[in-house]
């Protein structure tokens, strides 16, 4: 998997810090589902400390605050502007850690969560394993193959290099989590279909999310060729793997 330029990723998310919540419908659905999975799989679990990795604007932390109001919370993100928005959402009492999830030394926490973020790491398997071993419970959602395959296919049809991230498979994630010797591991993959008036609208959507990073770099000529090649409606989907991992008995 090619290395991801974290400076570019951080800049993209910083620019999107005010538009993100306006378009992040699926991302918010994933947060709701993740909280529901924690409650359903571990109904007696009451964490004293919660760490949200790749917290973005703080939506997942806000939901967890309602479920576990007495816990101490910490949010991490690579974007300062995203963390500023998150503090506006959840309050100044929540601690924050600015930095790249693959490099930050995170504290041991009862509950570590991450929703739609770890696929932005150059080595998501390493991050998943490391974070899991720092927690009693680790709950996550992550994009897996074949997410956004339709976008890459438009480029392949014109013999152009793929602009998208290389997503790992759900099987790779499953093996990584089992390697941590959990007492409980439950997971599922859900597909979220998306429809846009045109590929150009899809590009706009990704920019508003801050998700417009391309490991291959932005090539305006290639994009113009794709837009000319496929001017009509554009359909794509997110394939999201949800998991709850426990390494303790409750």
UniProtKB/Swiss-Prot annotation:
Classification via SUPFAM superfamilies: S-adenosyl-L-methionine-dependent methyltransferases (SSF53335)
Keywords: Biotin biosynthesis, Methyltransferase, S-adenosyl-L-methionine, Transferase
Enzyme class, first EC level, given as a word: transferase
Enzyme Commission (EC) number: 2.1.1.197
Gene3D superfamilies: Vaccinia Virus protein VP39
HAMAP family hit by this protein: BioC
Function: Converts the free carboxyl group of a malonyl-thioester to its methyl ester by transfer of a methyl group from S-adenosyl-L-methionine (SAM). It allows to synthesize pimeloyl-ACP via the fatty acid synthetic pathway.
Protein name: Malonyl-[acyl-carrier protein] O-methyltransferase
Organism: Neorickettsia risticii (strain Illinois)
Gene it is expressed from: bioC
């Amino acid at each position: 998997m090619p290395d991801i330029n974290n400076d570019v990723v951080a800049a993209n998310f910083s620019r999107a810090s005010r538009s993100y919540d306006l378009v992040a419908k699926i991302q918010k659905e994933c947060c709701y589902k993740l909280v529901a999975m924690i409650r359903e799989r571990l109904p007696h679990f009451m964490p004293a400390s919660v760490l949200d990795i790749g917290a973005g604007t703080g939506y997942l932390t806000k939901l967890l605050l309602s479920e576990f109001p007495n816990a101490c919370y910490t949010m991490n993100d690579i974007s300062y502007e995203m963390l500023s928005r998150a503090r506006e959402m959840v309050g100044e009492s929540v601690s924050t850690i600015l930095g790249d999830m693959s490099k930050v030394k995170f504290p041991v926490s009862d509950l570590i969560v991450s929703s739609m973020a770890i696929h932005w790491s150059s080595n998501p398997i390493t991050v998943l394993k490391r974070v899991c071993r720092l927690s009693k419970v680790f709950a996550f959602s992550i994009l897996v193959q074949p997410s956004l395959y339709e976008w890459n296919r438009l480029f392949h049809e014109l013999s152009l290099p793929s602009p998208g991230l290389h997503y790992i498979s759900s099987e790779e994630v499953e093996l990584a989590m089992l390697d941590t010797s959990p007492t409980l591991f439950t997971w599922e993959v859900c597909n979220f279909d998306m429809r846009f008036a045109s590929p150009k609208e899809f590009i706009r959507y990704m920019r508003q999310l801050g998700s417009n990073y391309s490991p291959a770099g932005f090539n305006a000529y290639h994009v113009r060729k794709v837009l000319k090649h496929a001017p009509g409606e554009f359909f794509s989907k997110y394939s999201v793997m949800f998991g709850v991992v426990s390494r303790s008995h409750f």
